[in-house]
């Protein structure tokens, strides 16, 4: 179903708006506070999957990953299904949940998580054949180096190469890369805060 033209399609832009707001919901904050009586940041950690694992255990971490993954996947799925993959809307729907996770309105745009799981959700929908093997390679390196960011550092560039090799439609490539760049911007901000690269 195409919704790329006309005033009747204006409501479709609610997809990225809502995606940004939902992106700002950080379940790791609530689960860690429930289990530990303090937020991840108060414990010196991040409110994502890895930080939740360290502070609240694997079950809580799995729940956090599932939620963060879904809030990335669902908006691009909706934009694709309801607007026929219209480029600008797909791009906005890809960036919005990751940006919402990274700089939540609920926190006054102060840094939230790093958006990795949400960007994975975006890219799994847009280019599954490219992302899955790239993600597996990233996970291997992350396990070897014992640092979660290596999933994205290795996985996202490799996914881009595979998208080009597999001739993924340009609108999907642009949207996926935009989500990856949004993760990268937050990671650069994180490195400045921590004064270390990884």
What spans do the regions from the language model cover?
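Nucleotide and nucleotide-moiety/phosphate-recognizing core
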Residues: 60-63, 70-107, 138
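N-terminal signal-anchor transmembrane alpha helix
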Residues: 7-36
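C-terminal ends of transmembrane helices
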Residues: 28-33, 98-111, 138-145, 184-194
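Short, non-helical or kinked segments that cap or interrupt transmembrane helices
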Residues: 38-47, 106-118, 147-158
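Helix-coil boundary and interhelical linker segments in multi-pass alpha-helical membrane proteins
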Residues: 1-15, 74-92, 124-130, 164-175
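Interfacial segments of multi-pass membrane proteins
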Residues: 53-56, 79-80, 115-146, 158-167
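C-terminal membrane-associated helical module and adjoining short loops/tails
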Residues: 159-198
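Cytosolic, membrane-interface loops and tails of multi-pass inner-membrane proteins
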Residues: 30-61, 111-112, 193-198
